[in-house]
Amino acid sequence: MKQRTLLAVNGTLMRGLELNPNLLKVGASFVREDVTDECYRLWSIDDRHPAMLRTSGKGARVALELWDVPLDGLAQVLLSEPPGLAIGKVVLKDKTVVLGVLGEPFLCEGKREITAYGGWRAYVQQRGGPTGTAGRDV
């Protein structure tokens, strides 16, 4: 049996979005929608993808999806992510800690903070873009 891990994704890896096929290609399966603890901030990187950072100051909950990913596919998923995104530890609302996609601080310099939208899908929807298949917009 393959070893697997939960991976929290908050941007274009989510269901129906541009990079979601990268998760499916490695045999990942969707688990559920969730949110982070109130210690994160979110930026739009030129409206192509988000970058989420943990903060020691004022943060908020950010919407995300949890995926069950084979460990041997995790590196492939990470390597297909845009530069400046990395995998680190993400704290969920219930204080569970899972692996998740985070942005490096330099990536957010001079970019638009979108934390107030609550997540990437909400931000994209406000802009009139496609929000993928999250069970409510198919």
Model-assigned labels for residue ranges:
Residues 2-138:
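Glycine-aromatic micro-motifs
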